């Protein structure tokens, strides 16, 4: 029975690949799962969604101008007895009234149009925020991968240097080397430990940044983050076209569409302001019950239906309407300038991300060759030292160069992935459209196109061969 239950559980897990793996007591997210979690929990996105809901309420309010309104009102008062009068002391009335707008000078139509435009604008702003959060999550995720890889590199480097120190101490005891070699090994190890501590601190900060994007609370005194991530820092070549990116950004970026809606809103607001200078006509009907104070006119209690038309027209309002229209025209001109500024800003974002991507490509090409050169230099230094033609200082310096070049290559891969994330956000495009391999796949993938950065950043097993 237990084996059957285990088999069923494995089938369910295989049928749900989108669910995060559980490492220990915390979930382990891939980068796509991290983006999905942020889309669901990020505070900025939640606030933007509430604003969208609020605009729907504004639309319902504006639409009410097309519908009849039903109101009831009543009055009761009792006056002090007056001398030389036969009027009744009590006065009361109650009415149930139905009102319907017949003509508002375009006010109701404009209010409904503005409400619809506000809904569209809020949705575009939500899309912009969601895109920005996606970019931030991708950057934070890659930063965490980078810092985790740096920790591994520094740990391996400390381990190798520690073994070298022990080796030199043993050789000193055997009388093979002098004390200077031991001191150099001690200095090299002492210099490397702060780099490890710094990498560990940066890794903790990366977890905090990603937790903030997730909207997760980190408990005071917690030694570990409430989640874990899976994958390795990888480089995937991508060569998008700048002109295509600029065209896509100008046509699809939500912030540009939101600024366009601002202009349309001000156009409708101008019609709404102008409606105050036109007549407004309302029809009404209802049923009324009221008292007659004068006994000579009729009985005290009266009731009956009422129907009529009410029209108002502000002939002169002290130029209030003119002032509102002037202010609306100024806001529209400002909205046009804001749209132009948004287009320039988006184009600048695209170009900046594109240039960063090109720079990262060049740095990666250079550092890949540099890593190979540093590896060869280390092997030569080790060979010379073993043959008695070199010094231990040459080996330590070569090992330091290898660690530094491989760490630099890790940083270049991170900058490449960051530039791709920024470019995807700037173009309002998905990762697939930009050929951005955002999914951190297995190292031994079928086509072998993804290069595992940690493999080329791993320090040598040993420094000395003697």
PLM segments and residue spans:
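Sec/SRP-type N-terminal targeting helices
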Residues: 46-50, 60-67, 71, 88, ...
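Acidic, low-complexity, intrinsically disordered peripheral segments
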Residues: 22-23, 80, 408-466
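Transmembrane beta-strands of outer-membrane beta-barrel proteins
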Residues: 71-75, 97-99, 282-286, 312
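A short glycine-centered flexible hinge/capping loop motif at secondary-structure junctions
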Residues: 172-176, 385-389, 426, 430
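Transmembrane beta-strands of outer-membrane beta-barrel pores
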Residues: 76-80, 102, 287-291, 315, ...
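Periplasmic alpha-helical coiled-coil/stalk elements that build and connect Gram-negative outer-membrane
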Residues: 129-248, 356, 360-363, 380-383, ...
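Bacterial N-terminal signal peptides
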Residues: 7-18
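Hydrophobic, lipid-facing positions within transmembrane beta-strands of outer-membrane proteins
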Residues: 92-98, 245, 305-311
């Amino acid at each position: 029975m237990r084996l059957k239950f285990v088999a069923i559980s494995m089938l369910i897990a295989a049928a749900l690949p989108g669910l995060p793996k559980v490492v220990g007591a915390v979930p382990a997210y891939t980068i796509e799962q991290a983006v999905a979690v942020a889309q669901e929990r990020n505070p900025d996105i939640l606030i933007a969604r509430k604003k969208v809901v609020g605009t729907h309420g504004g639309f319902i309010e504006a639409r009410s101008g097309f519908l009849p309104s039903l109101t009831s009102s009543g009055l009761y008062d009792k006056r002090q007895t007056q001398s030389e009068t036969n009027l009744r002391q009590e006065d009361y009335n109650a009415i149930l009234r139905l009102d319907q707008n017949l003509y508002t000078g375009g006010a109701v139509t404009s209010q409904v149009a503005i409400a619809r435009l506000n809904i569209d604008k809020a949705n575009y702003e939500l899309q912009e925020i969601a895109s920005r959060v996606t970019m931030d999550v991708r950057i934070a995720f890659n930063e965490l991968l980078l810092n985790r890889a740096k920790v591994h590199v520094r740990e391996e480097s400390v381990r190798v240097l520690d073994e070298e120190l022990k080796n030199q101490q043993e050789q000193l005891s055997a009388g093979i080397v002098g004390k200077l070699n031991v001191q150099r090994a001690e200095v090299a190890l002492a210099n490397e430990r702060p780099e490890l501590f710094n990498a560990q601190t940066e890794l903790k900060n990366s977890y905090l940044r990603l937790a903030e994007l997730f909207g997760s609370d980190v408990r005071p005194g917690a030694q570990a983050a409430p989640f874990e991530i899976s994958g390795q820092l990888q480089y995937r070549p991508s060569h998008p076209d700048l002109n295509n990116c600029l065209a896509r950004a100008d046509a699809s970026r939500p912030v540009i569409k939101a600024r366009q809606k601002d202009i349309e809103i001000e156009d409708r607001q101008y019609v709404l302001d102008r409606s105050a200078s036109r007549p407004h006509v309302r029809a009404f009907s209802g049923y009324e019950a009221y008292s007659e104070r004068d006994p000579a006119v009729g009985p005290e209690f009266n009731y009956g239906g009422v129907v009529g038309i009410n029209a108002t027209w502000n002939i002169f309002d002290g130029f209030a309407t003119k002032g509102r229209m002037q202010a609306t025209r100024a806001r529209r001109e400002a909205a046009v300038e804001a749209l132009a500024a948004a287009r320039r800003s988006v184009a600048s974002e695209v170009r900046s991300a594109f240039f960063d991507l090109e720079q990262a490509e060049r740095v990666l090409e250079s550092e890949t060759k540099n890593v190979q050169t540093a590896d060869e230099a280390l092997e030569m230094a080790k060979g010379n030292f073993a043959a008695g033609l070199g010094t231990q200082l040459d080996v330590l310096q070569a090992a330091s160069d290898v660690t530094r070049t491989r760490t630099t290559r890790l940083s270049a891969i991170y900058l490449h992935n960051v530039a791709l994330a920024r470019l995807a956000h700037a173009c309002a495009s998905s990762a697939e459209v930009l050929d951005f391999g955002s999914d951190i796949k297995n190292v031994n993938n079928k086509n072998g196109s993804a290069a595992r950065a940690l493999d080329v950043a791993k320090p040598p097993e040993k420094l000395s061969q003697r």
